[in-house]
Design a protein with these regions (language model features):
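Gram-positive cell-envelope targeting signals
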Residues: 1-30, 245
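Acidic-enriched catalytic cores of C-N bond-cleaving enzymes acting on peptides and small amides
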Residues: 210, 227-231, 250-280, 300-375
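Active-site metal-coordination/substrate-binding segment of hydrolases
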Residues: 94-194, 230-233, 364-365, 370-372, ...
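Fold-level recognition of mixed alpha/beta catalytic cores in primary-metabolism enzymes, strongest
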Residues: 165-257, 265, 269
């Protein structure tokens, strides 16, 4: 049985073998001069953290920021998507500079640790400020530095804490699901904008100049149920996984809880048939699932054997993800028996789709060493008597590779009797060889830090792709402070990187046009 499980989990090993070194610990010191910058940033961030703002539920935070900006004398436009737009006049002496848009998004991915009581629709984020470590984290949940950090930095700029030319502030919504906020921006909203600085990147030593496209794959089916014939119901659950952003961290070899559990169930099914009651896991399409659970029904006599098989499966997974997923846990517990269960053929089809789908790294770039070109993440699964829904997010910097993956999903769904809908997600953002922003940022960074800033393309979607499509030729970059483990409860922001980004912007916003 153990050999069978290891074979079924081979696809998971493929990703782990491609894993680069994990993120380094936070570092850096904050000077007395920069303490005021950090203090104001923290105050802004805590204001945001007090307002629940999961994707698709940004009305409250949009209203709060609208009122905040209006109190500062800004004339704010709020569209139907709850995006916010307002202009900030230039500091005296800088009125002749070109109009620069500063753009961030208001929503966040809300994920809680196992056992942590958290309702993302009603509960604030409990921010932990550790001055000694120089970090912001959250108590038991994601922090929301993606992209609360960008919003908080912009808030400090709007307050007048640095000199600048004319600015247009753009706060968008729903970036984390389908970028519907950015897609609601019109050409009129971008009138006269010469440059756009997106503050949604997660490394202060890097300027991002290109990003990948993605798609939203939703696979569904109508439950086919039959009367249960087995008398013992159990819940098999996987938990304790790292999770994280499915673009930025997909190459780190982290375990996908849904795919791993489906692999375990497949192995059990081949050895001893069971009846599937439900299968669920994941909280966002673009977050690697940290946990998943299935309720199955078995013969009472098979209970001890099942627990042994699950133990073998856990051991196989720990071997596959050694050094990466040290907190991985698989458990078996009693569940309430169901009267109706999935017919075995459909249950097998669901598990086959989950395990046979592309998950993790698909191709690596042949141009940029170490860059993932194409990948996919099985982000959510909800299988019960009420319905079947499986959500995936493929990404690629190659339109051909993205189309190739989409074709594979369609074929696999058809083979397993499922329906599929594929929608366009983020747009590709190609690098601009004629950019003025990039060389200016390189010069400023070199002057301020005595080293070269990294110029990178990323394997993730940024709203810059939407703005590129809307205003072809717009000169754009993406920058941001140091954030690790975004989209996971371990999300951490390096406070020393806030002044670093601040001083970069401080010079950039007065040099453009000179």
């Amino acid at each position: 049985m153990r050999r069978m499980i290891i074979t079924l989990l081979a696809c998971l090993l493929m990703t782990s073998l491609m894993a680069p070194a994990l993120c380094e610990p936070m570092s850096g010191t904050i000077s007395e001069e920069d303490t005021a910058i950090v203090d104001d940033f923290i105050a802004n961030f805590q204001l945001l953290a007090a307002v629940p703002r999961p994707s698709k539920h940004e009305t409250s935070v949009s209203n709060v920021l609208k009122g905040w900006a209006e109190q500062l004398g800004c004339d704010v436009i709020q569209n139907e998507a709850n995006d916010l737009f307002f202009d900030v006049p230039a500091t005296e002496g800088y009125e002749s500079l070109p109009l620069v848009a500063l753009q961030t998004h208001l929503d966040m991915v809300c994920v809680a640790e196992d056992g942590h009581d958290f309702n993302p629709l009603t509960d604030p984020i409990d921010v932990i400020v550790d001055r000694d470590a120089g970090t912001l984290t959250a108590d038991g949940t994601t922090l929301g530095a993606d992209d609360g950090a960008g919003v908080a930095i912009v808030m400090s700029i709007v307050k007048g804490h640095m000199a600048h030319g004319p600015l247009r502030i753009i706060f968008t919504t729903d970036e984390e699901i389908d970028m519907s906020g950015a897609l609601a921006v019109t050409a009129e909203d971008m009138t006269d904008v010469k440059y756009l600085v997106n503050i949604d990147s997660e490394a202060s030593d890097t300027v991002t100049v290109s990003s990948a496209a993605d798609a939203i794959v939703v696979t569904t089916g109508s439950p086919m149920l039959t009367d249960a014939t087995k008398d013992t119901a159990v819940t098999i659950a996987i938990s304790g996984l790292k999770g994280g952003h499915s673009g930025m961290m997909i190459g780190e070899g982290r375990c996908n809880g849904i795919v791993a559990l489906a692999g375990i169930l497949n192995g059990i099914s081949e050895a001893r048939p069971f009846e599937l009651v439900s299968l669920s896991g994941g909280i966002a399409d673009n977050a690697i699932p940290t946990k998943a659970q299935a309720v199955i029904q078995i013969d009472a006599a098979d209970r001890a054997t099942l627990e042994r098989w699950v133990t073998d499966g856990a051991e196989a997974l720990r071997e596959a993800f050694a050094g990466v997923e040290d907190g991985l846990t698989l458990t078996v517990s009693d569940a309430a028996p169901a009267q109706r269960v999935f017919v075995s053929e459909q249950a097998n089809h669901i598990l086959a789709y989950a395990t046979d789908s592309i998950n993790g790294v698909y191709t690596m770039s042949e141009v940029i060493d170490g860059l993932v070109e194409s990948s996919s993440n099985l982000g959510q699964i909800h299988v019960s008597a009420d319905g079947i829904e499986i959500r995936q997010k493929p990404r690629s910097s190659s339109p051909e590779r993205l189309a190739e993956m989409e074709d594979q999903y369609r074929t696999l769904a058809s083979e397993n009797g499922l329906m599929i809908d594929i929608a366009e997600g983020s747009r590709p953002w190609p690098a601009n060889a004629d950019s003025r922003l990039v060389p200016e940022i390189q010069r400023i960074y070199r002057e301020q830090n005595g080293s070269e800033i990294k110029v990178e393309a990323i394997h993730a979607g940024l709203e810059c792709g939407v703005f590129y499509e809307l205003a072809n030729g717009l000169d754009m970059v993406s920058i941001g402070p140091d954030v690790i483990n975004a989209h996971s409860p371990g999300e951490t922001l390096n406070l020393a990187s806030i002044p670093k980004i601040w001083h970069l912007l401080e010079q950039l916003l007065i040099r453009l046009g000179n």
